[in-house]
Amino acid sequence: MLEVRNLHAKIGDKEILRGINLTIKDGETHAIMGPNGSGKSTLSAVLVGNPLYEVTAGEVWFNGKNLLDMKPEDRAHEGLFLSFQYPVEIPGVSMTNFMKAAVNEKRKYQGLPELKAGEFIKLMREKQKIVELDNKLAGRSVNEGFSGGEKKRNEIFQMAMLEPTLSILDETDSGLDVDAMRIVAEGVNKLKTPETSCIVITHYDRLLEMIRPAVFTI
């Protein structure tokens, strides 16, 4: 699914990634651990196409396609998803409209018809149950006034809605209490299939005990 070969990347004049190699197969969950400044979040940013980072060497192949040649939105449409450590608030944009636009843009990219209003609401309610997302939260602006746990739960809800083939969870467990972490972990586990893979970036063992990745990279 994902093949990273000798990847080098920098921000400004500072090189952060120095020859990263990583192979992820269908159905695998990988845990990436390491101290602050080791490049964990930089790797996720480079994979999704954050323009602040410059790739200076190496290759990244995703499902047989050159990921580095793709625009960030095309990487998402191809099946890449990033759950942020600090999800941003988007005042004035309802969760329903935000997700409907995102889902239908991906369907359009795939050559599929847009979901009608009734079809979308049905899908949304099905996915809400997976992550135990309150219907009231789904009706509000994106992450506005959400607690830390609600924001992280909302990220997993977005993951459920978009059905990515490779999900990157960048310190999703940061700041969560045990109950919120359990709900997030259960959502991730329910979304696992033999065709989908996941990268879990973390400092802690707690989330890993709940998700149980097969491969550890330090």
How does the language model describe each region?
Residues Y86, G92-K108:
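Q-loop/switch helix immediately C-terminal to the Walker
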Residues E59-R75, N143:
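ABC ATPase NBD Q-loop/coupling interface
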Residues M181-P194:
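Helical segment within the ABC ATPase nucleotide-binding domain
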